[in-house]
């Protein structure tokens, strides 16, 4: 990925081979670029909880995120609750985290910051 392009502006690329799984050094480099996200599932996923005033806003966010996931062809695991949504990105085909997960995490954070 070109370092001049922010994660939120980048687009997902096919990443189906084990060599696309990010190592610890690259994870440490990218994690500060997605504030609020943390490594989960023993370092195999990125997770963040988003909080909302009510269930309607939670579902509006989840539906908007579904559209982004569809456009990027990279889909998170989500759990939806009253006033919060937990979003978890992982590249299942490689058994860990790829740059696609960071791209989608950044896009998800940008969506949240827009007040959706």
From Swiss-Prot:
Catalysed reactions, semicolon-separated: (4aS,6R)-4a-hydroxy-L-erythro-5,6,7,8-tetrahydrobiopterin = (6R)-L-erythro-6,7-dihydrobiopterin + H2O
Keywords, alphabetical: Lyase
Gene Ontology biological process terms, A to Z: tetrahydrobiopterin biosynthetic process
SUPFAM superfamilies documented for this protein: PCD-like
Enzyme Commission code: 4.2.1.96
One MF term in the entry's GO annotations: 4-alpha-hydroxytetrahydrobiopterin dehydratase activity
The UniProt record lists the keyword Transmembrane: no
Top-level EC class: lyase
Family: Belongs to the pterin-4-alpha-carbinolamine dehydratase family.
Protein name: Putative pterin-4-alpha-carbinolamine dehydratase
Source species of the chain: Xylella fastidiosa (strain 9a5c)
């Amino acid at each position: 990925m070109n370092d001049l392009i922010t994660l939120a502006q980048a687009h997902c690329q096919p990443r189906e081979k084990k060599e696309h799984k990010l190592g610890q050094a690259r994870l440490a480099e990218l994690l500060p670029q997605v504030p609020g996200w943390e490594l989960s599932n023993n370092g195999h996923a990125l997770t963040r909880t988003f909080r909302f005033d009510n269930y309607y806003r939670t579902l509006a966010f989840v539906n908007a995120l579904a559209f982004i996931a569809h456009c990027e062809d990279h889909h998170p695991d989500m759990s939806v609750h009253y006033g919060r949504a937990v979003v978890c990105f992982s590249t299942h085909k490689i058994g860990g985290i790829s740059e696609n997960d960071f791209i989608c995490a950044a896009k998800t954070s940008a969506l949240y910051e827009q007040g959706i």
